[in-house]
Amino acid sequence: MILQNKTFDLNPNDIAGLELVCQTLRERILEVVSANGGHLSSSLGAVELIVGMHALFDCQKNPFIFDTSHQAYAHKLLTGRFESFSTLRQFKGLSGFTKPSESAYDYFIAGHSSTSVSIGVGVAKAFCLKQALGMPIALLGDGSISAGIFYEALNELGDRKYPMIMILNDNEMSISTPIGALSKALSQLMKGPFYQSFRSKVKKILSTLPESVNYLASRFEESFKLITPGVFFEELGINYIGPINGHDLSAIIETLKLAKELKEPVLIHAQTLKGKGYKIAEGRYEKWHGVGPFDLDTGLSKKSKSTILSPTEAYSNTLLELAKKDEKIVGVTAAMPSGTGLDKLIDAYPLRFFDVAIAEQHALTSSSAMAKEGFKPFVSIYSTFLQRAYDSIVHDACISSLPIKLAIDRAGIVGEDGETHQGLLDVSYLRSIPNMVIFAPRDNETLKNAVRFANEHDSSPCAFRYPRGSFALKEGVFEPSGFVLGRSELLKKEGEILLIGYGNGVGRAHLVQLALKEKNIECALLDLRFLKPLDPNLSAIIAPYQKLYVFSDNYKLGGVASAILEFLSEQNILKPVKSFEIMDEFIMHGNTALVEKSLGLDTESLTDAILKDLGQER
């Protein structure tokens, strides 16, 4: 019926019917996410808002723009994907984010935060130029208002007065406890000159009254707070409505009708509860933001906890160990303290931890300034989000060679989050920047040594990367050794061909080495370690080998093999080099092993490729 694609069947006058739809949507979201994993609490909290949007607007004439879009599950269910929703985040299944190639109802690709208003402004401009009917409608979370791009877009929107509706989904939480959340932002407005001046004048008047009525002053202050949230937006030229109950369909429908009639920029402030409808998740924000498969009755994870430390945990433990001895160490993150492991530093040394909210550029620039003042900032950040701060890395850190330390988490193929979250670009863009030192560990033990090296390196910015979940190389296969600037490590010398691994690529190369040994082909194995600077002895190291095969989980263009080939060219060395890096395409979502197999990067495919290159068959 309604849920099979007929969004126009949602009757805005039938509130009881819409409430039943909301219940059905929540049941389906819980059913699928408990089986597949996904972004649960945000999607449950936004159900009524999305149903209200679909009840009043045709989303093909009035584009729906979901900020980040992890909260858009209800939208997917209402637009022909109710049955296929069971494939959510699965290989070749539905994406966990909006994706135009998946559905015509998904207007714009999303995955990173705070872009929705900027996209909406662009749509509104185009509609004005084309004299098209309709207006863009953006649904954004309170965490997204900490990013600069939001204010850049708001600045133009308020000036140009383009027709646009923004729904601010205020659940007092982005990904972690409310750094940059609306409640905190609005409390700052109360400290501003408008509020302070107005309040002081009224208090002055009230102070002349008898003491028996002085209670009016405090009552006034509380009343005035109710109008404060809209002041900021109204001053920018944006109509403000709210706050409203984001789970009250009657209020949502009536407010959207009003906003539609204004034909001007409007911000609707809707207050919602993350995890709404699933008691176990309500009020437990961070735990239920992004989840793996879980038991619906108990809320317990279906996956047993690994006894092996994740790379994030290995990094976090080592940083905490160093921070106990070195007071100059500070931790910086952009709204991801738990995901990057810095939550341990928060607990131990809260004054030396800085969550700058969703503001990656600010994270890098402010860290550069701290480095100039003699501190050792470890900027802990996902590879996919680091690209948002590229100019700050170049302009503020590298030109002045300030020793910030970039701890790049989720490097490589990350799995179910797909194109918008793969960590495949950092190698190519970082190695092109002068003064940047770049290296990568092969396992948890060498990751610990990488953190120690970064802490001691004080002559330039440095960056080290590590994967999500676990390294491909099992612990204890090779003895860990310390990092020496620009030095590689030859792990196995014997063989006619040389397998070169960088970072997590060492584990992949080692598995291929073992597979080839079963074919009576001996391979040497080199842990490149430093991509920049490369080992100055590299020409001597590779001299005995007929062919070189390079393994690394990053894009081939500008990647590790490119760096090696550039080095060989400068040395006038001719040597066959074959790259097993990622081809020039965006990589879809799905189980990491299945994605790697589809790319020919599993052990069997890699072994076959080398056998073919050597003129042998399996």
From Swiss-Prot:
<dbReference type="InterPro" id="IPR009014">
    <property type="entry name" value="Transketo_C/PFOR_II"/>
</dbReference>
<feature type="binding site">
    <location>
        <begin position="111"/>
        <end position="113"/>
    </location>
    <ligand>
        <name>thiamine diphosphate</name>
    </ligand>
</feature>
<feature type="binding site">
    <location>
        <position position="70"/>
    </location>
    <ligand>
        <name>thiamine diphosphate</name>
    </ligand>
</feature>
<dbReference type="GO" id="GO:0005829">
    <property type="term" value="C:cytosol"/>
</dbReference>
<dbReference type="GO" id="GO:0008661">
    <property type="term" value="F:1-deoxy-D-xylulose-5-phosphate synthase activity"/>
</dbReference>
<dbReference type="GO" id="GO:0016114">
    <property type="term" value="P:terpenoid biosynthetic process"/>
</dbReference>
<dbReference type="GO" id="GO:0052865">
    <property type="term" value="P:1-deoxy-D-xylulose 5-phosphate biosynthetic process"/>
</dbReference>
<feature type="binding site">
    <location>
        <position position="142"/>
    </location>
    <ligand>
        <name>Mg(2+)</name>
    </ligand>
</feature>
<comment type="pathway">
    <text>Metabolic intermediate biosynthesis; 1-deoxy-D-xylulose 5-phosphate biosynthesis; 1-deoxy-D-xylulose 5-phosphate from D-glyceraldehyde 3-phosphate and pyruvate: step 1/1.</text>
</comment>
<dbReference type="InterPro" id="IPR020826">
    <property type="entry name" value="Transketolase_BS"/>
</dbReference>
<dbReference type="InterPro" id="IPR033248">
    <property type="entry name" value="Transketolase_C"/>
</dbReference>
<dbReference type="Pfam" id="PF13292">
    <property type="entry name" value="DXP_synthase_N"/>
</dbReference>
<comment type="function">
    <text>Catalyzes the acyloin condensation reaction between C atoms 2 and 3 of pyruvate and glyceraldehyde 3-phosphate to yield 1-deoxy-D-xylulose-5-phosphate (DXP).</text>
</comment>
<feature type="binding site">
    <location>
        <begin position="143"/>
        <end position="144"/>
    </location>
    <ligand>
        <name>thiamine diphosphate</name>
    </ligand>
</feature>
<dbReference type="Pfam" id="PF02780">
    <property type="entry name" value="Transketolase_C"/>
</dbReference>
<feature type="binding site">
    <location>
        <position position="360"/>
    </location>
    <ligand>
        <name>thiamine diphosphate</name>
    </ligand>
</feature>
<feature type="binding site">
    <location>
        <position position="171"/>
    </location>
    <ligand>
        <name>Mg(2+)</name>
    </ligand>
</feature>
<keyword id="KW-0479">Metal-binding</keyword>
<keyword id="KW-0786">Thiamine pyrophosphate</keyword>
<feature type="binding site">
    <location>
        <position position="171"/>
    </location>
    <ligand>
        <name>thiamine diphosphate</name>
    </ligand>
</feature>
<keyword id="KW-0460">Magnesium</keyword>
<keyword id="KW-0414">Isoprene biosynthesis</keyword>
<dbReference type="GO" id="GO:0009228">
    <property type="term" value="P:thiamine biosynthetic process"/>
</dbReference>
<dbReference type="GO" id="GO:0000287">
    <property type="term" value="F:magnesium ion binding"/>
</dbReference>
<dbReference type="GO" id="GO:0019288">
    <property type="term" value="P:isopentenyl diphosphate biosynthetic process, methylerythritol 4-phosphate pathway"/>
</dbReference>
<protein>
    <recommendedName>
        <fullName>1-deoxy-D-xylulose-5-phosphate synthase</fullName>
        <ecNumber>2.2.1.7</ecNumber>
    </recommendedName>
</protein>
<dbReference type="InterPro" id="IPR049557">
    <property type="entry name" value="Transketolase_CS"/>
</dbReference>
<keyword id="KW-0808">Transferase</keyword>
<dbReference type="InterPro" id="IPR029061">
    <property type="entry name" value="THDP-binding"/>
</dbReference>
<keyword id="KW-0784">Thiamine biosynthesis</keyword>
<dbReference type="InterPro" id="IPR005475">
    <property type="entry name" value="Transketolase-like_Pyr-bd"/>
</dbReference>
<comment type="similarity">
    <text>Belongs to the transketolase family. DXPS subfamily.</text>
</comment>
<dbReference type="Pfam" id="PF02779">
    <property type="entry name" value="Transket_pyr"/>
</dbReference>
<comment type="subunit">
    <text>Homodimer.</text>
</comment>
<feature type="binding site">
    <location>
        <position position="278"/>
    </location>
    <ligand>
        <name>thiamine diphosphate</name>
    </ligand>
</feature>
<dbReference type="GO" id="GO:0030976">
    <property type="term" value="F:thiamine pyrophosphate binding"/>
</dbReference>
<dbReference type="InterPro" id="IPR005477">
    <property type="entry name" value="Dxylulose-5-P_synthase"/>
</dbReference>
